[in-house]
């Protein structure tokens, strides 16, 4: 714990020095300057009861994440942020279970946006099925390491992201994801979109010839309307292309169809996600040169998309609402899952709080 505290103090010291240096370097160029203290707090509880299932393990993910960061803005479109991402899982013997750097540049105007560096995943705007990212994976991977290019208007959005989450070394595989999400609305209530991901799961420094390619494509068509309740109904197609260059055998091409339904009012919602098709994670139990299965290190999606019976259904009942100009977000959900043989349960509770007090405003000379 002493080593971790020393590491934390050293990291904080370096961040403060870096921020001060950046403030000094940009001050001469700024038309207007503002300094904020962004603080994001997340409380997460995700309990899965999958006893008897071959698809997932019964476990509880329970903890908090704290991300304080200084944000320096100049002009109306540019900002630079630096801080730390700290995670503590309840019951852990460690002082902190994870600590990492947050540092990124952000550009934004009415329609276009860009982020470069290490930034919160919540800044992404895309719509992604849980076949791409499960709730547990998102809780454990809150930081994007790379680049995001974004476009939004009144009729839709588009986003391209590069997330480099593995550096080539003796301890870790080199790996990165390039993913896209785009959607457009038409005929008042209709929308069409597509999501795609290319995951390059490469080698470590101590072995080679064990690259895995994992591609997933999801075009969809939906309708969203109000009739006392808010309704969202979406039909999508999932096509995967995967190959393990170590095992050989060429490309595997599992696919399936997904129907999503949600109705909500006053924050209370009922949702259902019905998937019928192939096992989208055929390499899940394949063993790489580390001597262990690829598992969740390769696949970020919900493991129930590994269905052995060509069917997976997820029904959720819960409450989800934002308060205080969306600075406080709460969600509680009870989930029923079935693989066509048995019914399993999951409980999700999350609380997110964001505050951003202004520390300095050049136009006002000081923050009153």
What are these regions (language model features)?
Residues 76, 136-140, 302-304:
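A short acidic, glycine-rich active-site loop
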Residues 25-27:
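N-terminal signal peptide c-region/cleavage motif recognized by signal peptidases
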Residues 102, 153, 157-165, 169-173, ...:
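Exposed, low-structure sequence patches enriched in small/polar residues
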